[in-house]
């Protein structure tokens, strides 16, 4: 774990969570630290898959750690190939929630953020997946939403009880669920399904084919990157550089454009700020598209290093992690 001053980039502290031989193999595009750390402002949690889950305070003091077992995560149709984990932990109302989908024995677990003790653990009849769970703060209740090959599911985050499920997903699921005020968006890009589902909150039971699905698209879901809701539009970036914009409420296609990249594709997710959408490519180019119903490519910025991680936006800064460099990008001071 590394901590930096956001304003200056000065290193503040560094902690080694695990030392030893890795317990599993990994994909060539992955690392053993692919998951994103999470914090609620009091506890900082980092997840390294089979190498464990580690909690610190904001000064880097170790608080607790948990071994969740060896996770066998890889291609469902070629189990000898292990790709490694990528799902990140989330914090919600004093709970650390981790989705652990693997070849056999998939589960989702909630731990006490102060002690690391198990609060609940729910088994999942699922193939390996790589998306991060998300809590949809609905008007009537909160729903813990997970992507998955057999079913997209909603759980009660307090108990782990399944509330609803939706079939029809891809056999490989990587994007993270996202939401607006009343709609939940879950996508995946493995064909032949490659769906985008827009789901109304508050569902119960099996909602496959029901009116709880506001709209859906087939063979339009992104393979790795998570879609983006910005304003009244839903954006999706395919790994080959096809960029789609839809009307979030009704599902109408606004545009479908190819980003003019060279070489490799796109793995990081699009992010947005101040009316612009930023699309990072694996080659290290960040394309800038104006948000809204008309496609307008505003620029292309070369970072000159491979870029696999999604940028983070905080306190007027865009934080970009390339292969060897951590960048903070800000508006020029007047």
Regions of interest found by a model, annotated:
Residues 1-334:
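Noncatalytic, solvent-exposed loop/strand surfaces
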